[in-house]
C-alpha cells in the first residue's frame, strides 16, 4: 500500500498534505515492523487529522475533492487523455481503499503492537463516485483553493484566500435597490456565459457600494462566482491575473475598492490600458467592478 501511495501521479500533491504524509510514515513503519516509530507517527497523524475531523475517510475525501490536478484542469477544457483517464481510475480506486484503513488494520502487521493507542473513525461511501460527481460540477464547485474559498486578495502576485470573509447578505442592504439590481443582473449574465460589462459604482462613502459587491459574491458563490480584491497599487498585476484565471472553469469578479486618482497618478494609465484591452483579449470569465468614492477632483 505504501508503494501505491508513493506512486500517485494524478493526485501527487496529496503527498504534501500533513496528515497524508504522516499516514505514509505509518505504512512505512508497518513495512519495517517498527513499533516504536509507529507510536510516534500515529500521534503525529492523529494530531493533524483531529484538527479537521476524527474520520480518516472524510479527511481524505475532502483532500481528494479539493485537489488541483492535471485531470480536473483538463476535464474543464475537455482534454483528458485516455492514459490520464486510466491513471485517474486506478488512483481513485486505491484512495478509496486507503480511506478505509483503520488502526487495527495497521497494528495487525506489527509483532509488538501497542495496545494504548486510540484509533480513528472510517465511514462508507465511494470517493471515486464522489469525485466523478465533482468533476461534473467543476464549473460551480471549482478545484484547489477555489473549491474551499470564494474570496481572495492578491499578495506578491499570488492569490491568497480570505479565510473569514465578510458575511454580508443582499437582504441586509438598505436602499439603492434599483442600482443594486443592475449589478446583480450583470453578474448573473457573467455566470450564464452571456456578455457582461465592467462596472463602476460611485457615490459617497457609507452608501453600501463595497458591501453590495461582497454580498453579491456571497450570494452567487454556490453558482461558481469567486471574488478577487485588487488594491489600486496592484492594477498593473491585473493582466497576469487574467491570464492565470483564463482557463479556470469558475467565473470571477476583480474588485477594486477606493478607486480615486491624483492628476499625475500612473495607476490611471494602467487602468485605462486594462479597460481598452490587450493582445490577450477579453476573458468571458472575468468581470471588473470598481468603486469610486468621488473624493478626487479627477474624473474617471
Language-model features: locations:
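AAA+ P-loop ATPase mechanoenzymes
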Residues: 1-174, 178
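Short glycine-rich substrate-engagement loop in P-loop NTPases that contacts/grips substrate
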Residues: 180-184, 221-252, 265-269
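Short loop/turn elements that form and flank the Walker-type P-loop nucleotide-binding site
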Residues: 194-196, 223-224, 248-250, 281-285
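Walker A/P-loop
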Residues: 198-230, 243-246
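Walker B catalytic acidic pair
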Residues: 257-259
Amino acid at each position: 500500500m505504501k508503494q501505491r501511495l508513493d506512486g500517485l501521479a494524478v493526485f501527487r500533491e496529496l503527498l504534501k498534505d500533513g496528515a497524508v504524509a504522516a499516514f505514509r510514515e505509518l505504512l512505512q513503519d508497518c513495512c519495517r515492523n517498527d513499533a516504536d516509530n509507529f507510536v510516534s507517527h500515529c500521534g503525529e497523524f492523529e494530531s493533524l487529522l483531529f484538527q479537521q475531523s476524527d474520520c480518516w475517510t472524510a479527511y481524505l475525501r475532502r483532500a481528494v475533492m479539493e485537489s488541483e490536478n492535471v485531470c480536473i484542469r483538463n476535464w474543464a477544457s475537455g482534454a483528458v487523455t485516455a492514459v490520464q483517464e486510466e491513471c485517474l481510475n486506478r488512483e481513485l480506486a486505491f484512495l478509496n481503499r486507503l480511506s478505509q484503513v483503520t488502526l487495527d488494520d495497521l497494528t495487525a502487521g506489527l509483532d509488538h503492537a501497542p495496545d494504548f493507542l486510540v484509533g480513528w473513525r472510517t465511514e462508507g461511501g465511494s470517493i471515486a463516485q464522489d469525485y466523478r460527481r465533482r468533476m461534473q460540477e467543476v464549473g460551480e464547485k471549482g478545484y484547489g483553493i477555489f473549491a474551499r474559498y470564494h474570496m481572495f486578495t492578491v499578495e506578491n502576485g499570488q492569490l491568497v484566500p480570505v479565510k473569514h470573509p465578510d458575511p454580508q447578505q443582499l437582504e441586509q442592504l438598505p436602499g439603492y435597490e434599483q442600482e443594486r439590481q443592475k449589478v446583480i443582473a450583470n453578474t448573473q449574465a457573467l455566470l450564464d456565459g452571456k456578455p457582461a460589462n465592467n462596472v463602476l459604482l460611485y457615490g459617497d462613502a457609507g452608501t453600501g457600494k463595497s458591501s453590495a459587491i461582497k454580498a453579491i459574491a456571497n450570494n452567487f458563490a454556490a453558482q461558481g462566482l469567486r471574488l478577487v480584491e485588487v488594491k489600486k497599487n496592484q492594477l498593473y498585476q491585473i493582466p497576469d491575473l487574467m491570464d492565470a484565471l483564463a482557463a479556470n472553469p469558475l467565473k470571477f469578479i476583480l474588485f477594486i475598492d477606493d478607486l480615486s486618482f491624483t492628476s499625475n497618478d500612473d495607476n490611471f494609465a494602467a487602468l485605462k490600458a486594462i479597460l481598452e484591452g490587450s493582445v490577450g483579449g477579453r476573458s468571458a470569465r472575468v468581470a471588473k467592478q470598481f468603486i469610486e468614492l468621488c473624493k478626487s477632483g479627477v474624473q474617471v
